[in-house]
From Swiss-Prot:
One of its GO terms (biological process) is response to pheromone. The keyword rRNA-binding does not apply. SUPFAM superfamilies: Insect pheromone/odorant-binding proteins (SSF47565). This is Pheromone-binding protein 1. The keyword Disulfide bond applies. Antenna. This major soluble protein in olfactory sensilla of male moths might serve to solubilize the extremely hydrophobic pheromone molecules and to transport pheromone through the aqueous lymph to receptors located on olfactory cilia. Keywords: Disulfide bond, Pheromone response, Pheromone-binding, Signal, Transport. Disulfide bonds join C40-C75, C71-C129, C118-C138. One of its GO terms (molecular function) is pheromone binding.
Amino acid sequence: MLGKISLLLLPVFVAINLVHSSPEIIKNLSQNFCKAMDQCKQELNIPDSVIADLYNFWKDDYVMTDRLAGCAINCMATKLDVVDPDGNLHHGNAKEFAMKHGADASMAQQLVDIIHGCEKSAPPNDDKCMKTIDVAMCFKKEIHKLNWVPDMDVVLGEVLAEV
């Protein structure tokens, strides 16, 4: 009887563990994604105000509108080879990036699906940087719905410790 109960509860414990670990995984993904920032900052001559935009990205009520922030995100995504030359998500590379930084196959696919859905739902825009902002804000909204948002105090503390 105890064995049957344990088997029934196993998926619950696994699901609880996934929920608790998801913000940590998103934190790892964010930190590793931003490792390309130094190169992009120099290449695009990005001001500190845009860096502040990117640090505030995960805050629930924060809306990123600066075109250069979209350019910076697109630059980092390009450097990490997770987008194609047109700026669209490269599904295989993005999934591989997520798995390399802590996501299991299921979570990695879910992240790819979220971004792909955001690409499809974003209004048409010939400006790649502004299109990237629309996709990023949609992605953030979906991550908030899943309660996967990383603790920004921890993220900022770790980023500042590396500087």
